[in-house]
């Protein structure tokens, strides 16, 4: 037991932490070098070294998570290159949610927070937009959101 604690409390979850790290911290304009990756994993209770991380990156690639290595001078930076949604697509969805009259302000904020989780923390700030539509009042009825879903289910 003591040996496992020395190695790190979350070693078995290393690939999950790596995938989360790349999803939350990297994008086309933001990458991490090996030292940053090792430090961020250590903060999560995961010990790692360069050699095993290279193998882990390949495991992620084999699973379909596109990790790119980019040379920056003497350093190599790593980043996630492909996501389920592109940033412009998410901006469109955010604008649609904000402008939808039948979605409450609270539910709009919840949905937008979920959409923000699909991009890096850097790109998430670009999704914090405010769509202004004159004379558009958002509903106060929280059940409308679920009623629309129920109607759709009934139609199908």
Set out the residue ranges of the language-model regions.
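Bulky hydrophobic/aromatic content
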Residues: 86-156
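Short, basic/aromatic recognition patches that contact phosphate-bearing ligands
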Residues: 1-96
């Amino acid at each position: 037991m003591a040996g496992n604690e020395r190695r790190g409390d979350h070693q078995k979850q290393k690939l999950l932490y790596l995938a989360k790290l790349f999803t939350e911290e990297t994008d086309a304009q933001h990458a991490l070098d090996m030292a940053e990756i090792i430090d961020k994993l250590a903060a999560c209770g995961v010990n790692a070294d360069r050699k095993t991380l290279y193998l882990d990156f390949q495991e992620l690639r084999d699973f379909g998570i596109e990790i790119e290595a980019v040379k920056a001078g003497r350093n190599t930076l790593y980043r996630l290159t492909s996501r389920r949604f592109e940033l412009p697509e998410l901006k469109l969805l955010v604008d649609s949610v904000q402008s939808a009259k039948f979605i409450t302000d609270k539910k709009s904020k919840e949905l937008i927070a979920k959409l923000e989780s699909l991009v890096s923390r850097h790109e998430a700030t670009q999704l914090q937009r405010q769509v202004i539509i004159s004379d558009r009042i958002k509903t106060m009825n929280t059940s409308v959101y679920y009623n629309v879903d129920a109607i759709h289910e009934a139609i199908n």
